[in-house]
Amino acid sequence: MARPARRTVRRSERKNVEKGIAHIHSTFNNTIVTITDPSGNAIAWASAGTCGFSGTKKGTPFAAQLAAEKAAKMAMDHGMRTVEVYVKGPGAGREAAIRALQAAGLEVTLIKDVTPIPHNGCRPPKRRRV
């Protein structure tokens, strides 16, 4: 009989990273905050969904604020002090997430909007009639 395979437990080792990049992906339905080191390797991430929100509540500025606070705390546990913020998307949680990063104790050195804008690419979805 085959021996059962041993489960390897991955421990998140403490990375000492002083500077980082906070990527805020804000859509109408959710906000995802990923904090990476300068080369782009993820250190911490959180979203409105992982903070316990569901449905339409995920798109609110308050949900984005909690997601940014959670990601900032995890990043500060790894020794992060300053971040550059790259914001992508049209969602409601853009400014709330940036303010939450500053309030959590991270020093924001740069705020850049990297929302992709098409040069008339795909046809957009039809207008909603409510």
From Swiss-Prot:
One Gene Ontology biological process: translation
Gene3D superfamilies: Ribosomal protein S11
Keywords noted in UniProt: Ribonucleoprotein, Ribosomal protein, RNA-binding, rRNA-binding
Presence of the UniProt keyword Transmembrane helix in the record: no
One of the record's GO cellular component terms: ribonucleoprotein complex
Coiled coil regions, renumbered to chain: none
NCBIfam families: PRK05309.1, uS11_bact
Quaternary structure and partners: Part of the 30S ribosomal subunit. Interacts with proteins S7 and S18. Binds to IF-3.
The protein's name in its UniProt record: Small ribosomal subunit protein uS11
UniProt source species: Caldicellulosiruptor saccharolyticus (strain ATCC 43494 / DSM 8903 / Tp8T 6331)
Gene: rpsK
